[in-house]
């Protein structure tokens, strides 16, 4: 053991409680509420009884035809032009994400209509080409985008009911082609328990909401392009060397929240980054709730602290890539929650503790770590809110599609289990790495998420691997809440985080990804069983063991 840092501070926080009991009344969740939570992360530990789900065009046969399996198409009649219903759900709730596969002139006649609270007039009624337009549409870039895939992450809250449908005047007439609906539709939404008050979206937004929209768009642009500001003074800043088998241990006493953490490891080789284990224990519990190799927590296990690579799968910048040329990219990346620079990796996951915390970094590799630097910023609190969970990170690694692999769906497709837990908590994201030294595609598998449920199908069923990472068509781009570290060939490493659309659970959660490649990729998965590695980020109360491999 190299060092042990005791807590050096104690800050008293005075809580002013209104005499009228207003502290028991949560704020109404309106557009500004959801926008603010798209650019901040301090709310992530909050647990509640909401339920996040998805309505999509996933293939109900269990195959890979996920583009056009529409679930509720109303045929035209003499009195009605017909419609394609994408979502029909009761409130209170909020739509967080709407994705579509392609936008071409073939879809020019298709309109999207969104009705709130059983209103006779839709709040949005416009061509889908306009709805997803990141220059002249209703939402600003980067809250709407068409990088590798058209979509919007603009919140649409509703109090009582929400209906999302497609209409087209040519539907049912001679020459009609279902391709006019487009394909690979996904609508992600959350429903809240009845005590939660949600104010339905009003359009156009008022001046205050316009400021919130602009602030959120700017915050996302900054989050995807630069690292967060450092605190005026770090709570702890330690540097040491670590021989194989040795550890750095940092102890914190009392109550607080780790707001930011930065780690630098030299040499930043795959052996060292995969062999350096980070463990965090909360509130005096002996078993770690965070138990992950440093390189797989931050995603740079195979790429180090910012190196250059080339791939046909990289989409950089605002506009979609045309064709498939090789693109040079750096594995240094930035996001709202994690990032890697040329010198270090950083995390902004809030990590609360009520009765101390112990962070251990152990060198399990066979090489000497010449320099390990750890810095973190802690905010002291008098006590934690009762509804806060503790941060957890679970790392697992296994070969794909073996006899021991779990399987789901009508065709028993093998899956990688990212997280499977019982209790009360909240799943907020993943870092995924696939061992893939090939140019061809690896990710036709759908993401499936069960929360407080066990039957088939799950309430969240995606349409492919890359869509879960807000990307598409076998390529990846970078956003504030999702993106890539590395791409094929090599060790494609991609991440996705959930803010408003986090998956709360009261009894259990299961997160899996189908292992399906398509064409030569399918043969590789079935015959060579490449490694699938994941780090799941989640919160829980009470504290649980990470359960890592």
For every predicted segment, state its role.
Residues 18-22:
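Signal peptide processing junction and immediate N-terminal pro/mature segment
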């Amino acid at each position: 053991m190299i060092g042990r840092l005791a807590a050096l501070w104690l800050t008293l926080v005075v809580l002013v409680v209104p005499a009228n009991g207003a502290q028991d009344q949560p704020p109404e969740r309106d557009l500004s509420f959801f926008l603010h939570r798209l650019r901040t992360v301090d709310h992530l530990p909050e647990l509640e009884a909401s339920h996040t789900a998805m309505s999509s065009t996933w293939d109900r046969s269990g195959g890979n035809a996920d583009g056009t399996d529409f679930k509720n198409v109303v045929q035209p009649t003499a009195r009605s032009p017909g419609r394609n219903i994408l979502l029909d759900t009761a409130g209170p709730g909020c739509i967080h994400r709407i994705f579509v596969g392609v936008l071409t002139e073939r879809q020019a006649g298709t309109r999207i209509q969104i009705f709130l609270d059983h209103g006779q007039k839709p709040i949005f009624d416009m061509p889908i080409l306009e709805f997803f337009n990141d220059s002249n549409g209703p939402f600003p870039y980067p809250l709407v985008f068409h990088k590798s895939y058209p979509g919007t992450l603009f919140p649409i809250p509703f109090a009582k009911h929400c209906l999302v449908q497609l209409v087209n005047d040519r539907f049912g007439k001679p020459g009609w082609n279902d391709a006019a609906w487009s394909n690979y539709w996904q609508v992600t939404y959350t429903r809240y328990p009845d005590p939660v008050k949600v104010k339905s979206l009003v359009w156009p937004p008022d001046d205050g909401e316009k400021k919130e929209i602009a602030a959120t768009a700017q915050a996302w642009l900054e989050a995807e392009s630069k690292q967060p500001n450092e605190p005026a003074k770090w709570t702890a800043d330690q540097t040491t060397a670590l021989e194989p088998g040795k550890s750095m241990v940092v102890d914190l006493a009392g109550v607080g929240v780790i707001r930011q953490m930065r780690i630098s490891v030299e040499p930043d080789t795959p052996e060292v980054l995969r062999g350096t284990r980070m463990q965090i224990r909360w509130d005096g519990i002996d078993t770690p709730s965070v138990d992950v190799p440093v390189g797989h927590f931050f995603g740079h296990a195979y790429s180090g602290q910012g190196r250059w690579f080339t791939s046909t799968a990289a989409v950089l910048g605002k506009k979609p890539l045309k064709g498939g040329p090789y693109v040079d990219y750096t594995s240094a990346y930035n996001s709202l929650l994690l990032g890697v620079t040329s010198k270090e990796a950083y995390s902004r996951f809030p990590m609360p503790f009520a009765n101390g915390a112990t962070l251990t970094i152990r060198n399990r590799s066979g090489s000497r770590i010449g320099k390990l630097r750890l810095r973190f910023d802690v905010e002291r609190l008098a006590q934690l809110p009762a509804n806060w969970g503790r941060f957890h990170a679970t790392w697992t690694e296994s070969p794909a599609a073996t006899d021991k692999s779990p399987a789901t769906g009508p065709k028993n497709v093998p899956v990688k289990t990212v997280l499977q837990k019982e209790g009360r908590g909240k799943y907020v994201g993943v870092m995924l790495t696939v061992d893939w030294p090939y140019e061809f595609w690896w990710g036709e598998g759908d993401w499936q998420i069960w929360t407080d449920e066990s039957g088939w199908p799950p309430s969240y069923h995606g349409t492919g691997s890359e869509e879960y990472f807000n990307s598409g068509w076998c390529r990846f781009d970078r956003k504030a809440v999702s993106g890539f570290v590395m791409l094929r060939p090599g060790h494609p490493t991609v991440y996705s985080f959930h803010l408003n659309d986090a998956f709360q659970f009261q009894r259990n959660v299961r997160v899996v990804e189908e292992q399906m490649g398509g064409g030569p990729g399918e043969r590789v998965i079935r015959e060579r069983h490449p490694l699938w590695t994941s780090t799941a980020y989640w919160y829980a109360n009470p504290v649980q063991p990470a359960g890592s491999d």
